[in-house]
Design a protein with these regions (language model features):
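Short beta-strand element of the alpha/beta-hydrolase
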Residues: 64-73
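Active-site glycine-rich loops that stabilize anionic/oxyanionic intermediates
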Residues: 72-77, 239
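Short beta-strand/loop motif that positions the catalytic acidic residue
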Residues: 229, 235-237, 241
Length: 318
């Protein structure tokens, strides 16, 4: 009898605890059953040949009309899916943003240029394709990336008007007809320069090879590709980052200024490369809130429960 009583008490207590459940949905970006026969330039039909996204939906009580495609880093040879993927999705979900974590093709899967760019462009188009169903405003779809993923995000924001790099015989579908321009960019310690001493050589080699032609190096030097249509951008770096020095971000920020693109950049004194949300790193740990306030002040997000697009005042930094 005592055991039964304890079990009853345990069930009652646990039933009173708050339940946090995040709905997720995996979407293969090019369905092999579709007319295009799978991802362009696919080397096979294994999972590694099928770029996909995991959609993290916020709780309906806080959901707003904004979505962001997240590109984890990894030097174009791996993907940091936890601290630059899952944790970022959970953070965005907390204030209502639908988050789409992209698992793009990279060198250790056998892929380089142009496939990562094709994958992020397809991811942005896929979000627009599902915007109605997911409750997303088609003009509030951004892209965020870390390190090499930040480079990929920057190419999404600078090459959306280019002719797509589809192979001969590729059959475009309804998703391909949509715009792949992100409405905003968040670039976290991104690789930007491919033709300077400050580049991350491993990312460059994995994407375009060691002996890439000058034209391709320049194509992927994102600071040289900024135009008047490049989206508003938030950038952060740390001064102690020796893997991807902040000169990368400075070059991109100055290019944005030359084209009158709204931009904000933070260089924190402390912190190594690859911090993700930077929890537990004094000073640098404020970047997520600074980013949230920037998104709020530029009208890309709103406070949950506010039914119009008024820009609310920033909350006190913690």
């Amino acid at each position: 009898m005592p055991n039964r009583l304890l079990l009853t008490i345990f069930i009652l207590l646990t039933s009173m605890l708050p339940v946090f459940s995040v709905e997720q949905q995996k979407i293969i970006l090019w369905d092999s059953d579709a007319t295009n026969g799978g991802a362009p330039n696919a080397l096979g039909t294994e999972d590694k040949d099928k770029p996909h996204v995991t959609v993290w939906f916020p709780d309906k009580d806080v959901a707003i009309e904004t979505a962001v495609v997240v590109c984890p880093g990894g030097g174009y040879g791996a993907l940091a899916l936890d601290h630059e993927g899952r944790q970022i999705a959970e953070w965005f979900n907390a204030f209502g943003v639908t988050t789409i974590v992209l698992e793009y093709r990279h060198r250790n899967k056998g892929y380089g240029h142009p496939n990562p760019l094709l994958d992020v462009q397809r991811a942005i188009r896929t979000v627009r394709f599902h915007a109605d169903t997911w409750g997303i405003a088609p003009a509030k779809i951004g892209v965020l990336g870390f390190s090499a993923g930040g480079h990929l995000a920057s190419t999404a924001g600078t090459h959306f008007d280019d002719p797509p790099h589809f192979p001969e015989g590729y059959a475009a579908d309804a998703i391909d007809a949509l715009s792949c321009r992100p409405d905003f960019m968040v670039l976290c310690y991104p690789v930007i320069q491919f033709d300077a001493a400050a580049t991350h050589r491993g990312s460059q080699n994995n994407l375009i090879g060691q002996d890439a032609p000058k034209e391709l190096v320049e194509y992927y030097s994102s600071e040289k590709q900024v135009t008047d249509r490049t989206p508003p951008t938030f950038i952060f770096f740390t001064d102690e980052d020796t893997a991807v020095p902040p000169e990368n971000g400075v070059a991109f920020y100055l290019a944005l200024r030359r084209h009158n693109i709204p931009a904000e950049m933070h260089i924190f004194q402390k912190g190594a490369h690859g911090l993700g949300l930077a929890q537990g790193h004094p000073g640098t740990e404020h970047w997520p809130e600074l980013c949230r306030v920037w998104l709020l002040n530029n009208g890309f997000i709103r406070e949950p429960g506010v039914l119009d697009d008024r820009i609310m005042g920033p909350q006190q930094l913690r």
